[in-house]
């Protein structure tokens, strides 16, 4: 068991910090917003709830939800133009502070790369530091499925990405920050996990995370000490 003060020290000395995106870096769940935009909100948000609670394997839940939504390329582009995701208060300052300290910041999401890259651009995070699912479209722009080879398409995918980052960049300390069970499961291989409940509180995470925050100000404060 790592003590709270050890966790704080680990966060402050990390050479990489990985953030979940939906309900962590942004206030919304991207897939639910896409479903709402495409007119199938209720059915899809119930599936998301089950997936986040760990009741359904991630890839199966993603396949089912996308089969309902059937988003076209144009719908995704219009969603970003008309209803762009809202950054969670404090995240811009936190990411900026980490980058000033030469900490690598990554976004690891079970959501969609087109949405996550839009978020990354707002935070000055290079697209090479984004790991998310890729939607596939036919040449006419209609939905053609998703890239099932991406690690983020699987249960345990976030842990696979972190393992890959350690192998590639030889990071000594990686911290994962997120709201969901899939984020908590990424530690290990992450060296520490910080639960985030600023947008939605998932009881399983709140009960089991050694360090649980509801405001990014707390992490900013730890860096300033």
Curated annotation (Swiss-Prot):
Note describing how the cofactor binds: Binds 1 Mg(2+) ion per subunit.
Main subcellular localisation: cytoplasm
Chain sites annotated for binding O-phospho-L-serine: 52, 109-111, 158, 182
Pathway in which the depicted protein is active: Amino-acid biosynthesis; L-serine biosynthesis; L-serine from 3-phospho-D-glycerate: step 3/3
Cofactors demanded by this protein: Mg(2+)
Keyword Ribonucleoprotein: no
Compartments in which it is found: Cytoplasm, Cytosol
Catalytic activity: O-phospho-L-serine + H2O = L-serine + phosphate; O-phospho-D-serine + H2O = D-serine + phosphate
Positions of L-serine binding: 20-22, 109-111, 158
Any one Gene Ontology cellular component term annotated for this protein: cytosol
EC main group: hydrolase
Disulfide-linked positions: none
Protein role: Catalyzes the last irreversible step in the biosynthesis of L-serine from carbohydrates, the dephosphorylation of O-phospho-L-serine to L-serine. L-serine can then be used in protein synthesis, to produce other amino acids, in nucleotide metabolism or in glutathione synthesis, or can be racemized to D-serine, a neuromodulator. May also act on O-phospho-D-serine.
The family this protein is said to belong to: Belongs to the HAD-like hydrolase superfamily. SerB family.
Binding site for phosphate: 53, 182
CDD domains attached to this UniProt entry: HAD_PSP_eu
Modified residues annotated as N-acetylmethionine in this record: 1
Matches recorded under InterPro entries: HAD-like_SerB, HAD-like_sf, HAD_sf, PSP
Residues bound to Mg(2+): 20, 22, 179
Pfam families: Hydrolase
Keywords assigned by UniProt, alphabetized: Acetylation, Amino-acid biosynthesis, Cytoplasm, Hydrolase, Magnesium, Metal-binding, Serine biosynthesis
Alphabetical GO biological process terms: L-serine biosynthetic process; L-serine metabolic process
Record's protein name: Phosphoserine phosphatase
GO MF entry, a single one: magnesium ion binding
E.C. no: 3.1.3.3
Subunit structure: Homodimer.
């Amino acid at each position: 068991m790592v003590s709270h003060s050890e966790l704080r020290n680990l966060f402050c000395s990390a050479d990489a910090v990985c953030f979940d995106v939906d309900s962590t870096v942004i206030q919304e769940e991207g897939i639910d917003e896409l479903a709402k935009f495409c007119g199938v909100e209720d059915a899809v948000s119930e599936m998301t709830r089950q997936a986040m609670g760990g009741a359904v394997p991630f890839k199966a839940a993603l396949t089912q939800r996308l089969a309902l939504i059937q988003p076209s390329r144009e719908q995704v582009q219009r969603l970003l133009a008309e209803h762009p995701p809202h950054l969670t208060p404090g995240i811009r300052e936190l990411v900026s502070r980490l980058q000033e300290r030469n900490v690598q910041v990554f976004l690891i999401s079970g959501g969609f790369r087109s949405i996550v890259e839009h978020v990354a651009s707002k935070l000055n995070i290079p697209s090479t530091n984004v790991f998310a699912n890729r939607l596939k479209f036919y040449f006419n722009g209609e939905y053609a499925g998703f890239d099932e080879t991406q690690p983020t398409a699987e249960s345990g995918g976030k842990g696979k990405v972190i393992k890959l980052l350690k192998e590639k960049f030889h990071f000594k300390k990686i911290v994962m920050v997120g709201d969901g069970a899939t984020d908590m499961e990424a530690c290990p291989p992450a060296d520490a996990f910080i639960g985030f409940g600023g947008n939605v509180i998932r009881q399983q995470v709140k009960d089991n995370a050694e360090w649980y925050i509801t405001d990014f100000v707390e992490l900013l404060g730890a860096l300033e000490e």
